[in-house]
């Protein structure tokens, strides 16, 4: 009979311990109830990207001197620079410039080392397509400035996320 009483007492202690653990978890859940939601409704709400965000590369054709520094510093040897040597003025003339964003790792080396600052990073990050060949941007597509999220009236921008308290 005594073993049965001790088992019943152990069962009671285990029940109290389990209820305490459940209560602790419930208290953590309730402590999060008064916080603002962290999630955003993506297609309709977007976060404003930081100033140093590395998005799609913008290219200014008139500034480029076809020095190919961007090709040399790129870890993927990605930018394709076609140029022709003008013998009368002894300078290179840029014919075509293209970057395949399906291969680009957005490291920013080409932007950092460009001597004429003809390359810059934009805040555009929505580059998905159904055909991977559409990710190969020529100088015309690279020269197009993206629409700013701030200027788009159909999208609600979120400036500050609520800080997570630890």
Swiss-Prot record:
Gene Ontology annotations of biological process type: photosynthesis, light reaction
Reaction equations catalysed: a plastoquinone + NADH + (n+1) H(+)(in) = a plastoquinol + NAD(+) + n H(+)(out); a plastoquinone + NADPH + (n+1) H(+)(in) = a plastoquinol + NADP(+) + n H(+)(out)
Cofactor binding mode and count: Binds 2 [4Fe-4S] clusters per subunit.
Molecular-function annotations in GO: 4 iron, 4 sulfur cluster binding; iron ion binding; NADH dehydrogenase (ubiquinone) activity; quinone binding
4Fe-4S ferredoxin-type domain span: 55-84, 95-124
Source domain of life: Eukaryota
Residues binding [4Fe-4S] cluster 1: 64, 67, 70, 114
InterPro entries the UniProt entry points to: 4Fe4S_Fe-S-bd, 4Fe4S_Fe_S_CS, NADH_quinone_OxRdtase_chainI, NDHI
Cofactor: [4Fe-4S] cluster
Major localisation: plastid
Subcellular location: Plastid, Chloroplast thylakoid membrane
Short name of one Pfam family: Fer4_9
Membrane topology: Peripheral membrane protein
Entry GO CC: chloroplast thylakoid membrane
EC number assigned by the record: 7.1.1.-
Keywords noted in UniProt: 4Fe-4S, Chloroplast, Iron, Iron-sulfur, Membrane, Metal-binding, NAD, NADP, Plastid, Plastoquinone, Quinone, Repeat, Thylakoid, Translocase
Binding positions for [4Fe-4S] cluster 2 per the UniProt entry: 74, 104, 107, 110
Protein family: Belongs to the complex I 23 kDa subunit family.
Function: NDH shuttles electrons from NAD(P)H:plastoquinone, via FMN and iron-sulfur (Fe-S) centers, to quinones in the photosynthetic chain and possibly in a chloroplast respiratory chain. The immediate electron acceptor for the enzyme in this species is believed to be plastoquinone. Couples the redox reaction to proton translocation, and thus conserves the redox energy in a proton gradient.
Self-association state and partner proteins as the record states: NDH is composed of at least 16 different subunits, 5 of which are encoded in the nucleus.
The protein, known as: NAD(P)H-quinone oxidoreductase subunit I, chloroplastic
Annotated organism of origin: Steiractinia sodiroi
Name of the gene this protein is made from: ndhI
């Amino acid at each position: 009979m005594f073993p049965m009483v001790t088992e019943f007492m152990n069962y009671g202690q285990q029940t109290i311990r389990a209820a305490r653990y459940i209560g602790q978890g419930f208290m953590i859940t309730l402590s999060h109830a008064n916080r603002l939601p962290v999630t955003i409704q993506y297609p309709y709400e977007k976060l404003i990207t930081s100033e140093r965000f590395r998005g799609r590369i913008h290219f200014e054709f008139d500034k480029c001197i076809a020095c190919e520094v961007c090709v040399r510093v790129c870890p993927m040897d990605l930018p394709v620079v076609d140029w022709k040597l003008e013998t009368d003025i002894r300078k290179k003339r840029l014919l075509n410039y293209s970057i395949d964003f399906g291969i680009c790792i957005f490291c920013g080396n080409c932007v950092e080392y460009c001597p004429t600052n003809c390359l810059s990073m934009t805040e555009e990050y929505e580059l998905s397509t159904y055909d991977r060949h559409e990710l190969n941007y020529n100088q015309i597509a690279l020269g197009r400035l993206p629409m700013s999220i701030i200027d788009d009236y159909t999208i609600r921008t979120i400036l500050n996320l609520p800080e997570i308290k630890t």
